[in-house]
Design a protein with these regions (language model features):
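Basic polyanion-binding and macromolecular-assembly surfaces
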Residues: 1-192
Length: 192
């Protein structure tokens, strides 16, 4: 029902190495003495990933004969709203290392064809410059066939061509993007 693609870096690897020790763990392990050194790769980059949701299958489990689409449509809607909130404020915590993974560019909508239109289609043509012409090409294809409405949210300051993104793609804030998607989800389930 919900699929996340792998996150792919949009930039070449340019990283660093973090070295640390774990004295607390070493002190709790009787046969290990020392600081138990470790290292971790540090890579800062813009990443792209795709999330696809088949709204017709939310709450449906044929193996257990569950169909919330018929029994509790509100639960289906609430699940997708919570998913959107999770993506909007995404972060990760691993070994006391917290990373902000909130989207800085988001594009999508509800389409009448189940296809991840933007998967592997975002690229940076130069340093922090989003390839707007490639996105426009995809949008023209979607719009020419009346497949649905596409929304775009962007933190313009994070891209060197923020003004081009705003004027060419008619982007809005990330908050407005997610608000419009939530509204689309509400409308979708209200009509079913």
């Amino acid at each position: 029902v919900v699929r996340f693609s792998n996150a792919i870096s949009l930039e070449n690897y340019s990283g660093d190495m973090e070295f640390g020790t774990n004295l607390s763990l070493a002190n709790r392990t009787p046969d290990k003495k020392g600081l138990l050194p470790y290292n971790a790769e540090i890579h800062k980059s813009y990443y792209a990933y795709t999330v696809t949701v088949d709204l017709d299958l939310v709450g449906v489990d044929e193996n257990d004969n569950i169909d919330l689409q018929k029994d509790n449509i509100e639960e289906c809607k609430d699940r997708i709203i919570k998913l959107l909130e999770g993506i909007e404020f995404l972060h990760r915590d691993i070994k006391a290392d917290s990373k902000n993974m909130n989207p800085i560019f988001a594009i999508g909508g509800i389409y009448n064809i189940k296809n991840p239109f933007f998967a592997n289609r975002l690229e940076l043509s130069e340093y922090k410059k989003l390839n707007v012409s490639l996105i426009n090409e995809i949008l023209n294809s979607i719009n020419s066939k009346n497949m649905g409405t596409t929304y775009i949210g962007c933190l313009l300051e994070k891209f060197s061509n923020g003004e081009e993104i705003k004027s060419e793609l008619k982007s809005e804030s990330i908050v407005n993007f997610f608000n419009k998607l939530r509204e689309e989800v509400n409308n979708y389930y209200a009509s079913n």
